[in-house]
């Protein structure tokens, strides 16, 4: 499952290496972990609950790009943020298992769009894959830095 893939991709990453960014616009491994933690708590589970059970409440906005600097993602403790994310993920999995006959076609309309419960759930899974890909790419950059001056072409096309 994607949780275990994320856990494996974070395994063995030293705190200082987790803060490295390939360029000024890119996220570090630590920033990805912090983002996953915030998304787990404040976006996907929360908004899926809005769609399924809280139609009369106001959908709250998220600011994924802003949170990176506002919440000082790259200054956080890697081990603590990993633990926080995995605890939240367990809460999410328990919450999902506790849903009784969810209506995946039920929709919620925000000021931006209408989204169904099924679409939100599918996007949650897709979001994990997006960041799994990002973590793989960040690990590749890390490997390039560690193995320099040697080139990695023989390993295959990247």
Predicted features, each with a name:
Residues 19-64, 107-158:
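Short, contiguous alpha-helical
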Residues 2-5, 45-51, 86-89:
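Short low-complexity stretches enriched in small and charged residues
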Residues 1-27:
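A glycine-rich, hydrophobic loop/mini-helix early in the fold
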Residues 8-11, 15, 49, 53, ...:
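Charged/polar positions within long, soluble alpha-helices
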Residues 2, 66-105, 119-124, 132-134:
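Acidic/histidine-rich alpha-helical segments that form the ligand environment
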